[in-house]
């Protein structure tokens, strides 16, 4: 039996606040643009002395992410961080500098510090917040080599304080939604499986006023979700379909919908994966975690939109009752599917989840997210772009625009009837993979999904290359990224919320 206590969301202990400029800090971090000989010190932090020390003791020139430390009178320690070229400074760089500052303070074993980078307080604080995520609750001994940063105070002018505090509070809430997604993705699969995952989604999201409905195996059988049930039949863990509702606009407004793949562990089934690297397949539910995260974010900021989140949860296991290559299953849509590879299971559970979502809710659009294909990594590499497939140009362009704004970038791939015909099955309506040698595996997977989308505006995001990061980034430690939460939150905020 699992314990919900094990699922405590990993919100960091570090305290981040916004405060008016004051010299009353032992360690202060200040920013300096490239080739600039004046540092913004708020008029009280001895900026001229800092510049003199740089000239005398260092070749520091303000390159982005470069650091220089110097001591000042009264036992003050000043750390200068390079901001790069002023004309290239933007919101994403503000976030990245915040994360870099957090890492530098940790490296220097500094537990408390103030930060002054004029005009960028909220984003710098947010970057530090995002980078501070940690997931170490299963460790029984603390690593003494690591110094935890306990408190960062970001300084602003008096007249900017109120706006900066309000902006950061809005960003912090989104950050907590990202942390929720990261925590789910990082949980081990013996702790996070369909039943426990569904229970914890309900526990976390009902706090914010979201409505949660959980369909069990019997209910899915009644709805004839043969594609989803076929994937789950080899596991002792029963599948779940979780429906999340946010009602932030009038009842007359059509909802928008997000659908997530939630394979809590993927062995590949009978089409078994290689053992090397299989441990990373606990991440195969990252799409569902993003959906949970974005629904959490929308409710947290009381977004003026009606939104539906649907996550299909199953474990793809090897067992005596596991699905076999060449099985034929009947999906909720009534279409029959020849299963040629049991490791192409994500598209099977999404087939029923997409059909269920459009059939029940008639949404304005559906966006599904899934760690669907290794081929997307071959095409785009790791961590830079997620793959985008869509039947609607306006939706696709808006997704690309939102992704560029928050640096969660998308690259659109083609879809057409020629590709679609390749996945026709000789004995069923469709087969779940293309014949050997066809190539374009990510496109074929998307074409398969489109078979279960009627006239609804739809987009598919293949996040297999962006869901986790082996080395970490300025705003994310090594591991789960929570990719898509910021992107979809921005999409809704910019294009789909009701006007006042």
Curated annotation (Swiss-Prot):
Give any GO molecular function from the UniProt entry: manganese ion binding
Q: Where is the active site?
A: 273, 347
Which stretch is the leader sequence? none
GO biological process annotations for this chain's record? Answer: proteolysis
Provide a GO CC annotation, any one. cytoplasm
State its Enzyme Commission number(s): 3.4.11.1, 3.4.11.10
Cofactor(s) needed: Mn(2+)
Compartmental location: Cytoplasm
Entries under PROSITE patterns matching the protein: CYTOSOL_AP (PS00631)
Binding annotation for Mn(2+) 2: 261, 266, 284, 345
> Which residues are Mn(2+) 1-binding?
266, 343, 345
* First-listed, main subcellular location of the protein, grouped into a coarse class: cytoplasm
Q: Which reaction does it catalyse?
A: Release of an N-terminal amino acid, Xaa-|-Yaa-, in which Xaa is preferably Leu, but may be other amino acids including Pro although not Arg or Lys, and Yaa may be Pro. Amino acid amides and methyl esters are also readily hydrolyzed, but rates on arylamides are exceedingly low; Release of an N-terminal amino acid, preferentially leucine, but not glutamic or aspartic acids
Q: What domain of life is recorded for the organism?
A: Bacteria
Cofactor binding notes: Binds 2 manganese ions per subunit.
Keywords attached to this Swiss-Prot or TrEMBL record, sorted alphabetically, are: Aminopeptidase, Cytoplasm, Hydrolase, Manganese, Metal-binding, Protease
Quote the PANTHER family the UniProt record gives: CYTOSOL AMINOPEPTIDASE, LEUCINE AMINOPEPTIDASE-RELATED
Q: What does this protein do?
A: Presumably involved in the processing and regular turnover of intracellular proteins. Catalyzes the removal of unsubstituted N-terminal amino acids from various peptides.
- Tell me the NCBIfam families matching this sequence: PRK00913.1-2, PRK00913.1-4, PRK00913.2-2, PRK00913.2-4, PRK00913.3-5
What family is it from?
Belongs to the peptidase M17 family.
What name does this protein carry?
Answer: Probable cytosol aminopeptidase
Instruction: Write down the species.
Output: Wolbachia pipientis wMel
